[in-house]
Amino acid sequence: MDKSEQDQLKKEAATKAAMMVESGSVLGVGTGSTVAFFIDALGERKEKENFSLKHIVTTSNRSKKQLEGLGFQVDELADIDQADLTVDGADRVDDNLDGIKGGGGALTLEKNVAINSKKVIWIVDESKLVHHLSGFPLPVEVLPVSAEQNFKRFEEEGLKPQWRLDDNGKRYVTHYGNYIIDLAADPTPVPHGLADYLDHTVGVVEHGLFLDMCDEVIIAHSDGTIEDKKRK
């Protein structure tokens, strides 16, 4: 499958998600190539229908600029009580609809938007599907003051930590001024147990395990089909 065919599949999946958004609702919007098609589809609805949104919050400047370019006003998460729906991508999704996110470094905001949403839908292509969470480093955002100690503890736990670096080879700094340690242990060991360990580790701000958060995944398959999978 070439890129144009893959993009067409992503567009179809994104359009399906866009049709699930109710006019007048509060919407959370993630980021990524498939989400970009989703935003375009929202713009088409705005142009062709009597479609508007009460509030929109997003997890990236890229999505914010795209939305504003289509005439949508983007608000801060602090400006809303709760999103009716959040649509985002994912780096990996397992059979239970649990996932790894944060490959772009915005995991803390992504999780805050997701946790403050009544419903969460992820749009992915089939390359992101796994039976057990694996094949993608798990990002952990840590405070600089205790980052070295966190790194050593992760090493001792056999989690194969790696500093995330920027384009200049320096430690990547998040929007909130923190570092990211990517855990390369593969497959991700006992996701719920690891999440609990990270949640109780001093210095950890947030991690990329999104467990029991996603309600529905729209999947673009290479055979041209679009699958809608819901949490059981």
From Swiss-Prot:
Reaction(s) the record says it catalyses: aldehydo-D-ribose 5-phosphate = D-ribulose 5-phosphate
Superkingdom of origin organism: Bacteria
The species this protein was found in: Lactobacillus gasseri (strain ATCC 33323 / DSM 20243 / BCRC 14619 / CIP 102991 / JCM 1131 / KCTC 3163 / NCIMB 11718 / NCTC 13722 / AM63)
A GO molecular-function descriptor: ribose-5-phosphate isomerase activity
EC number of this enzyme: 5.3.1.6
Gene: rpiA
Protein name: Ribose-5-phosphate isomerase A
CDD domains, alphabetized: RPI_A (cd01398)
Subunit structure: Homodimer.
Assigned keywords, A-Z: Isomerase
Database matches in InterPro entries: NagB/RpiA_transferase-like, Ribose-5P_isomerase, Ribose5P_isomerase_typA_subgr, Ribose5P_isomerase_type_A
